[in-house]
């Protein structure tokens, strides 16, 4: 792993935030710009990235003119649209990020640090983004990502086969839940990278990951209407809690 770093300081350069917002959502139409507690959901991450004050560029990667206009209205840059290759249902996030980095390179701009932010992550805050960058610099990590603990121990999980349940790992049957190792999953919010290590990995997961542990009340995957409503409930709850 390359461990050369520049001092972050108050005016760290060569840092880009890339918000990935494709227009073709099928399960929740126009998901990335749908109203969420009073404004388009993508607005939350744009505002958080700008407020963090650590990015030279906050941009949105999209194939949608509507998403582009709304994103610009909240302060993000949209200097180009996605290619056909990165606009389909099978495009990998890593390919989108590579495309953005290469496009900026062709415009004479290269970045040392990058944060990929998902547009439907309203729990992302400026403080979390700064925390990630500080961890990236301090620990000389290749990547920093938010994670949250599984609410129920996966090692006590079951699989269904031929209409019957079987424990996936029966060796843990007699173990108390509190005695099992805590396992975590991706919070699905953002990834911060040291760009040379991102290129080296060739995918969104690199070696040398430093975690930021998030409370489960600040994490919600949004794939359907039930998820959306749950996210709004959590968001309102967290807002009330901060008052």
Task: Give the label of every model feature segment.
Residues 1-11:
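N-terminal amphipathic/basic-hydrophobic helices that include classical n-h-c signal peptides
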Residues 15-16, 56, 77, 112, ...:
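Conserved acidic residues
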Residues 59, 66-114, 124-134:
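Short phosphate-binding loop-to-helix
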Residues 93-95, 113, 122-208, 213:
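Conserved core of the sugar-phosphate nucleotidyltransferase
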Residues 117:
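Catalytic metal- and UDP-sugar-binding loop of GT-A-like glycosyltransferases, i.e.
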């Amino acid at each position: 792993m390359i461990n050369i770093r520049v001092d972050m300081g108050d005016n760290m350069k060569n840092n880009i935030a890339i918000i990935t917002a494709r227009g073709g959502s099928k399960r929740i139409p126009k998901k990335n710009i749908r109203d969420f507690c009073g404004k388009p959901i993508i607005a939350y991450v744009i505002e958080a990235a700008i407020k963090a004050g650590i990015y030279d560029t906050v941009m949105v990667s999209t194939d949608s003119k509507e998403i582009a206009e709304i994103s610009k209205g909240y302060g993000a840059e949209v200097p180009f649209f996605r290619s056909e290759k990165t606009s389909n249902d099978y495009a990998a996030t890593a390919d989108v990020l590579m495309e953005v980095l290469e496009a900026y390179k062709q415009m004479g701009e290269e970045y040392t640090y990058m944060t990929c932010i998902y547009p439907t992550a309203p729990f992302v805050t400026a403080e979390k983004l700064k925390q990630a960058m500080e961890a990236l610099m301090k620990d000389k990590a290749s990547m920093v990502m938010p994670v949250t603990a599984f609410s129920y121990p996966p090692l006590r999980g079951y699989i269904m086969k031929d209409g019957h349940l079987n424990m996936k790992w029966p060796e843990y049957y007699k173990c108390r839940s509190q005695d099992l190792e805590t396992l975590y999953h991706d919070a699905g919010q953002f990834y911060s990278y040291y760009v040379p290590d991102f290129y080296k990995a060739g995918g969104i997961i690199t070696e040398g990951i430093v975690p930021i542990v998030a409370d489960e009340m600040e994490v919600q995957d949004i794939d359907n209407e039930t998820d959306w409503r749950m996210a709004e409930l959590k968001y309102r709850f967290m807002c009330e809690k901060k008052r």
